[in-house]
Amino acid sequence: MADMELTPAAVEAEFEWVRHRSPVVVPLINETRDRLGECFGVEVGSVTADAYRDEVGHVFADGTRAVNVAAYVALLRDLDVAGDYPGFVVDEVLGRELAATVAGGQPFALLAQATFHVADVMTHTDGVAGADDLDAALAAGFQTRLPGWEWTEGESAFSVD
């Protein structure tokens, strides 16, 4: 196992990798939104590649969030297990946490973790064990924070003046 050191340059490299992953992540975001919309009987707006890339910029603009997102991304990009052993769940744990970190605070973090599992069953990325969990986590986290869900648009019915 190689050592991993997160430096500002390493975080920037992960930012670029995540940003350029839009051809894979954006269709998965939209497939996930379609599936969730069907389950809940609601229309959910689709996400464009430009909106995704802009939001990646917002996530990585927060240094505290950026260093943690970069660490999860780097770990999942290299994480593998011999024979893709069924009892190996570390990739699932890291994927859920990445989705939550991208999404932000509660309730979005928990919603992103739940959405991770929906996206994960629809994702089959070639490569190491963590590859599909990485794509699913990015899709779940960004779909949660991006506009398109009616309940997140406008004032909450539970706001107190």
Q: What residues fall within each predicted segment?
A:
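Acidic, polar-rich N-terminal leader regions of halophilic archaeal proteins
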Residues: 1-161
